[in-house]
Amino acid sequence: MKKTFLLSLLLLLGVVACKNSSTGQITPQKDVITNQIYFAEKPIVSAHRAGKGIAGYPENCLQTIQYLSKKGIHSFEIDIFESTDGDLMLMHDDKLGRTATGQGVVSQMSTEALLKERLKDDFGKETNFQIPLLKDVLAWCKQHGAYLMLDFKKGISYSKVAELVRAEQMQTQVVLISYNVEQAKALYRVAPEMLISVTIRNQSELDRILETGIEREKLVAFTGVHLADDSLYKKLNELRIPSILGTLGNLDKRAEARGDHLYKEWAQKGIQIFSTDRPFAPKF
């Protein structure tokens, strides 16, 4: 009886916490994978490069994902490269130095050599954290209900990434990022069951994407790092295609200077996801 009461209390507290959250929470899907999970009660915050500007927590780092998850952030954009051993790993830069100790082009290094280095935070401080393997990040996110937007470094095999996502049973928790129509079509061919982020900054780009034959329910629209015309957000909402606004850079700086209330104003245009370097700033 006592155990039942405690379990009920914990579930109730969880529901209240979600309702009181300042950002949107993604509702998991089990069987059918559609973009409707991103139409939450409130806009969803997605941490660019898995979290930037946080002392002691580097970008593209599993421990940063774990830290932000505890703070209520559950969507993360990460960058994928491949070592000479064929292991998929996380890093944005082509070379070591800025975000990790050591020197060298990461795609020309072995996994063993890369794992010897340590990640640095955005302030140049060395941490004890290793460059993460994608499989470890996928496994943790699967277990803890975190969602990933996967950005491919040049030359990465789409099918290899898709196979690893499937192996870790993360198909329902990823978005594959494309930057042009041909890339979107290629991703759809190798992973038709997964969601795909497509660049849609205007009506013309929307029309070209709709002509590809990619299922509409698999699309997530990246509308750029500047505000698009209000009519585009209206149209995307009519089509039930969730939109991402990349506030990273210019718009984040504007909000920092003029006030974080701007995120809420932008959300009212019909934006479902904010990709930001300031994950704690947006409040909805």
Predicted regions span which residues?
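Bacterial Sec-dependent N-terminal signal peptides
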Residues: 1-28
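Phosphate-group recognition and catalysis centered on beta-loop-alpha active-site segments
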Residues: 18-284
